Design a protein with these regions (language model features):
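Active-site catalytic loop in hydrolytic enzyme cores
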Residues: 9-18, 67-91, 289-368, 372-373
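CN hydrolase (nitrilase-like) catalytic-core segments centered on the catalytic cysteine
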Residues: 27, 54-55, 197, 206, ...
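Generic structural signal for well-ordered alpha-helices
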Residues: 34, 38, 201-205, 346
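Active-site catalytic pocket residues across diverse enzymes, especially alpha/beta-hydrolases
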Residues: 41, 113-116, 218, 374-378
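Non-cytosolic juxtamembrane linkers/loops
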Residues: 141-208, 395-406, 411-418, 422-423, ...
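Soluble catalytic regions of membrane-associated enzymes that act on cell-envelope
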Residues: 151-316, 351-353, 359, 363, ...
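Non-catalytic surface loops within mature trypsin-like serine protease
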Residues: 300, 353, 393, 457-459
Length: 495
């Protein structure tokens, strides 16, 4: 199953065939672990089967969301994306809450089916009556939970209708091109890709000339075209430049090219109130050290001193870094891969309209706890984001199902944090998602286009925003306790 779900990984780069198989085998291990956990809770601790199954499943999902670098795509909750009446659960307990309810209801249904098949051969009426009472209570719990979720969804719709018209947070232009991405792409290919993005941006600006565009968003790594942004505390010294294997004239040429590119994009929008969020590589220069970052560059023409960037915090293993890579530099050169540094903190920016946004890059929105952490930290700093923006370059995956998995995570991130989510994706799927998880507008995969999004504020509070995944952590701990006690009895008590 996992090989089929994740087959798009292999399309990015030939060494990732091994990564695709390894990741699939790793994820497959969780099924027998889940069965063992649920069985132990049910038989050893006498936890009712629906509760045992749901607890064990959520425990496994939480563990794989954190273990090593974390992988929280293709969760059971994502199967409910087509049915928005289940999604409000995520605003209280995250995607783990939806997974819990789906597994709980599935186990209740299996219990009824098993009872229906076996009741003819079961001569114990007392046992049968006890089962009926217990499973009826479980069914009632599931029905009440679903009704509350549906009520939450419809009550918010009613509130929005009563408040209409609601002033949008801003007018945001999301750009999507159909440029495939490859590790061994030539400089000419990168320049061509940049030119296509520039032309599409200018065309979209011309079509929407009557609109005041507050923000233009380019996907991950599409602005670089082989020329990175530079972050230097002071003027780079010759020693610093030597670490980069470049000369001072090279540096001046790159800086000049960056200035030209920014001016060319800005020329399509004569109003200086327009801001720009551009996916680019950044070279971070520090005395005696050079680091490469995957960043979202913020460009404010009215105040260039406020230009800055958000550096991706959660790097993709084998794509952006390789464990212990510094010990094998020759291997990195052989397969044509480098390694990046991780960012340190979330960043918030403000539009001319006054709205604040927070950015994530690539598969960062696959980790529910990371986005929740961004929102929580920024709120504590007095910079609570009104909307979330994800920039990603999914051109690696050639239109495969990986794009659908990625969009599903963005949808749940919007619901969990009760904020609209905007996705700008190279090759797709770019989308405008509201705080209920509804896709207001999206672009087809592998097609060029743009979305003119006007997201509305969603000021609702959700339990997830305050406590994050602590309920899921408790379930994970509880599901592991039978193993802990079994090991304790085996090795400690016997000794």
């Amino acid at each position: 199953m996992w090989l089929a779900l994740l087959q798009g990984i292999r399309l990015a780069f030939w060494p990732l065939y091994a990564g695709w198989i390894a990741l699939s085998l790793y994820l497959a291990v969780y099924l027998p672990i889940f069965i063992s956990m649920a069985r132990s809770l049910h038989r050893s601790w006498h936890v009712p089967l629906p509760m045992a199954a749901a607890t064990a499943w959520v425990g496994c999902e939480l563990i794989r969301a954190y273990f090593v670098t974390g992988f929280a795509a293709c969760m059971l909750a994502h199967s409910q994306i087509p049915w928005p009446w289940m999604l409000p659960v995520a605003s209280y307990f995250g995607s783990y809450g939806i997974s819990f309810m789906v597994m709980f209801m599935g186990a209740v249904l299996c219990q009824w089916i098993r009872w229906g098949i076996s009741k003819r051969s079961d001569k114990s009426n007392a046992r049968s009556n006890k089962f009926i009472v217990a499973n009826t209570l479980h069914t009632l719990f599931a029905v009440i939970a679903v009704c509350i979720s549906i009520w939450s969804l419809h009550s918010n719709d009613s509130w929005l209708e009563s408040q209409a018209p609601i002033k949008p947070l801003g007018t945001i232009l999301l750009i999507q091109e159909d440029m495939p991405t490859q590790f061994d792409g030539s400089p000419e290919d990168m320049i061509l890709g940049w030119q296509r993005y520039e032309q599409l941006t200018a065309f979209a600006a011309d079509i929407n000339a009557s609109k005041q565009i507050d923000l233009v968003v380019w996907p991950e790594s599409t602005f670089s075209a082989g020329v990175p942004w530079f972050d230097s505390e002071n003027t780079p010294t010759p020693a610093d430049l030597e670490l980069m294997a470049v000369t001072e004239s090279d540096m001046q040429m790159w800086l000049s090219q960056l200035e030209v590119k920014l001016n060319r994009i800005q020329s399509a929008f004569p109003n200086k109130a327009t801001r720009y969020l551009l996916g680019t590589d950044t070279v971070k220069l520090r005395p005696g050290k050079v680091g490469k970052l995957n960043t979202a560059l913020w460009f404010d023409p009215e105040n260039r001193a406020m230009c800055g960037y958000y550096a991706k915090q959660h790097l993709v293993m084998f794509g952006e870094y390789i464990p212990l890579a510094s010990s094998f530099p020759a291997l990195l050169r052989l397969i044509g891969m480098g390694t990046m540094e991780a960012g340190e903190k979330p960043v918030a920016w403000q539009l001319a309209s006054g709205a604040t946004l927070s950015t994530s890059i690539c598969f960062e929105d696959v980790l529910p706890h990371l986005i929740q952490s961004h929102v929580s930290k920024l709120t504590a700093m007095g910079k609570s984001p009104d909307m979330l923006v994800n920039i990603t370059n999914d051109g690696w995956f050639r239109g495969s199902s990986i794009l659908d998995h990625h969009l599903n995570n963005a949808i749940l991130a919007a619901v969990e944090n009760r904020r609209p989510m905007l996705v700008a994706a190279n090759l797709g799927i770019s989308a405008w998602i509201d705080g209920n998880g509804r896709v207001v507008r999206s672009l087809p995969r592998m097609q060029a286009g743009w979305i003119l999004a006007e997201p509305i504020p969603d000021g609702r509070w959700g339990l997830w925003q305050s406590i994050g995944d602590w309920p899921a952590r408790f379930l994970a701990l509880f599901s592991c306790l039978p193993f802990v006690f079994a090991l304790f009895r085996r090795f400690v008590v016997r000794a």
